[in-house]
Amino acid sequence: LDEILGHDLFNREVEVIKTDRGSEFTCADQAEVRSDGTRRTRMFFCDPMASWQKGSIENVHLLLREICPKGCDLKAIGLIDQHACNIISENINSYPKEKLNGKSSFQLLEFLSHPTAKKFYEFGLHNISNSDEVILKPYVLKKR
């Protein structure tokens, strides 16, 4: 994200990261500080077995599990490159949410921070404007 958004925009948009204590976050200090020593963000960890402390991000995990069921072979479903990751992200972030009055995360981002949305579009992520075309199933990667 730091590379996609650029340092200034990243610092403005990602002041903190709240996560669990998964093994992927064992080097949190490297995520918090750039190689030049400047502060990138601050990471905070939820208590063990307290996923409710992460708020609505758990709902995103549920959507991700619709596409990538736990224990599935990610390569077998087509998750082999950045393009595949983008397809998953586009579908999850284009999914309308009741909590957002039927809007998607992409639509909210466009409204709250057009410069950030523009950077994601430049990276290759796009909103799926017709919600009927959003696919939250493993075969979404086979349709590319």
Feature names for model-found ranges:
Residues L136-P138:
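Short A/G/S/P-biased low-complexity tracts
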Residues G6, G22-S23, G55, G71:
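Glycine-centered flexibility motif
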Residues N11-C27, D47-M49:
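Acidic/histidine-rich, metal-coordinating catalytic segments
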Residues R12-E13, R39-T41:
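Loop/turn elements at helix/coil->beta-strand transitions in domains of secreted/extracellular proteins
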Residues L1-N11:
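Active-site beta-loop-alpha junctions of metal-dependent nucleic acid enzymes
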Residues Q30-R34, R40-N130, V140-K143:
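Charged alpha-helix within mobile-element recombinases
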